From Swiss-Prot:
S-S bonds: none
Protein name: Ferredoxin
UniProt xrefs under SUPFAM superfamilies: 2Fe-2S ferredoxin-like
Role of this protein: Ferredoxins are iron-sulfur proteins that transfer electrons in a wide variety of metabolic reactions.
Keyword Acetylation: no
Domain of life of the native organism: Eukaryota
Species this protein is from: Pyropia yezoensis
One Pfam short name: Fer2
Location(s) in or outside the cell: Plastid, Chloroplast
Amino acid sequence: MADYKIHLLCEEEGIDVTFNCAEDTYILDAAEEEGIELPYSCRAGACSTCAGKVTEGTVDQADQSFLDDDQLLAGYVLTCIAYPSSDCTISTHVEQELY
């Protein structure tokens, strides 16, 4: 089973951290295990509270039901139901960008 390096960034929140995440672990769960506090609400991919934007790398978020095709193409991700499929960099706390 592969582990990937996840780099989270949010200048406003003072977040600039890298941690390992297994390919079968949700990014939000792995961040919490590292003591990183990220926003979340439903934990089911049905809202936008945990939204991030992938700026490098790829994720698998097939379980999400909230983001539309344009948002997915733009790189938005719901960290509560996203598995890493490569090393990636994600900007966090971007929910307001979706509206």
